[in-house]
């Protein structure tokens, strides 16, 4: 240890001096020749905010472990160790050395954008997530040396040689901190997750199914059930397929929901993907009914033979409480509309679950550990598990799901492949669905689908070289939520396919679309002050008059008038106008809370960034102060009546999950213990003997209300504005997306698409510069991973 310290002292420097980076004033090769010089360089990058302290500590750990075993690591190995840790913090599962060496600056996003603000926006926060970035002028450019400068001195082959020679690196057969698989370098934990998921998928895809033989009794029952559940449809328009333009005629009679049910029914692992309103929930409910029909018919035959059998045990889950509540709301109605009496197998309502839980609750989370109660040694009691909003599930959680599933259990993933990937490392759904637009169904699959569904599969979906995974992935291609002329639909498709053109942008500026308006689209570079004034006014009113036809005259799918777009005055007025008091019942207060929570969800501001004038922190403060000036809230800081809050961390003691939204009320202090424990903050009028309580909807979808004292809430923030990431799993009648005045690495096509598709009926856009919208659409989220390669048979170990 003393020897190491002496060596360190030889390279001691003052971070405040111009000699901040050794290699900036000397030969860059020094950092790749001496371990201590390399670690000094990492320290400098960390001090500048380019990488995290965790990344530096990991490199130091590799050094220490290697020294303990008597062989000092090459500085290049330490550099790569720090960079793979950095990339995991940015959501990547690994570092592909070939990609890294081809363009290190772009791969690493190091250095960040050259301007101070953009550079700060690219810096991951100290908690380790790169998804919510901010402008911070205190972080500076650490001289001239960059990771790309160091990596330019070596080749991919030299990296491989150094890594293969390092004691801390292995191909996975030994326990080492780093795993090298081909040219992909992993932290061991994430390599194990990837392998576990791939093994779980492949094992399920290989399991024989009684449905595979189209002449079997089970297949006949499935076909009969699907014919009951799906009536013939008219022409369906393809959505989001790269090949659709060449194949529209061949799709005229294809019911993609029916095809998805058939494909998913015959495989122990299946994925159903589709954009908003394509009927993922409806499809999976019909799928479960069809599976129970097959199970019921089999049960009847077994009972006739004196054998025992059972229906499937089915569980429904979602990544967040908010997503679970949404699925709860929609699935109950979908189940109630099923023609169960007409199905074979005596399917009853009780056979189709309607209760949705979070993945954390399903797996049995435990405090202070990422390990769950259910695992390989204590698997779930389940035959079929359905996970909605699967795009939000990171690699770690997906591995935990596979660990907790019995080998015979069927896993069905639902989600939109084009939405933002999970906050933490991985893009599991996106990687599984890479080939979904073009199907790649084998001739045997095509023949089976024809036999079961009586459907001719379009030629563009057929591929004699299709992979096993392709046969278990189905894509829904028609949106039932948005009308043909919907601006939300048109804009989302243009963003998703990168086909934005001047005409589409002009229609948004002119409010030609009936449901979309770009509020400041005519101003190429509006001032910050004018944009903030626009945001504040929009937050209050929703700018109904800015929409086509003043936001009036639109009808929903049932021919009923749609309510016009609103702002936050809508829910705050509802709170101010009620006449409840200490004589009112808890039930009456609950009903008011339900109405207010529903009114609050009618409008939501979404941001790409967390900090800075364009981020949620700055805008929440700005909007609160404006609402206070408009006398819609009593104060703009602390706890107050009307304050909306977003839970930012799971609290299992309170039953609150990350993403849950509540509204603060002033309620009578004598309402009883069900309102919450603890004195908490007093209300804004001390003389009324009232207390502040936060109303949250229960996560079981029942519509009940839970009242929590503010003093018991630990991880939360005000939520007049939320990040697009936090909005996943939610939808709002009117969504306003606010984009900054310049492009940053987090402003991507996936983020913009996700923001647009959170809008159910109305979408408004405010930008700090008109160019950022198109420029952001041109940037894609590409996360390094090896899952697809492993599933395609790329086994290098």
Annotated model-derived regions:
Residues 2-224, 230, 234, 240, ...:
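Accessory, non-ATPase domains that flank or precede helicase/AAA+ motor cores in DNA-metabolism machines
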Residues 65-68, 103, 107, 166-169, ...:
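Conserved, well-folded catalytic cores of nucleic-acid-processing
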Residues 100, 197, 320, 388, ...:
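Residue-level signature of catalytic and energy-coupling elements of molecular machines
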Residues 406, 638-641, 657, 727:
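Residue-level recognition of short, solvent-exposed, well-ordered loop/turn junctions
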Residues 497, 610, 660-667, 674-797:
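C-terminal accessory regions
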Residues 418, 422-645, 651-653:
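Conserved helicase motor core of P-loop NTPases
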Residues 259-261, 265-513:
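ASCE P-loop NTPase helicase motor core
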Residues 224-236, 251-269:
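Conserved pre-motif I regulatory segment
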